[in-house]
Amino acid sequence: MDVDASIEQVTGILVREGLRYQMSADGRTHRLLFGSAAVFIDFNEWQDDSVVITVHSPVLQDIDSASAGAAQALNMLNDLNRSFFFVKFTYREGILIARYDLLGETLQAGELVNALFEIAGAADRLDDELAEVLGGKPYEVKAEEWSGD
């Protein structure tokens, strides 16, 4: 299965499940909004003929890399990863990310929907709570900044 076929399959699942999404200008990324969180779906080639579908959400952005909050984010990764069965958390360049990887060639609708709700639930639950501890901004705050509202 190639990336284009995976994008088409995921789009079909989202439509059939009644999940509202927006597509990036290049047609390669889906964005879904859940509460104060945004969940993105990206597609990457893997090995010779496979596709990895990554469902991810920026839980917090703009964490000052030189701050105590950044150090604390790194220190919490293990606890966060142990607290959620399927979600993995990473910290990179001031962004705390929740992600879930799926294999495209065996993707089933239930798997994708579960991944979306697991990531959305984790991000929406943690964004406000961790913003106070780590600094940084939830997606909803960043989106308002970008739009100038």
Per-region residue spans from a language model:
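Short, internal acidic amphipathic alpha-helical interface segments
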Residues: 56-99, 148
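Hydrophobic residues embedded in beta-strands of well-ordered beta-sheets
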Residues: 28-30, 51, 96
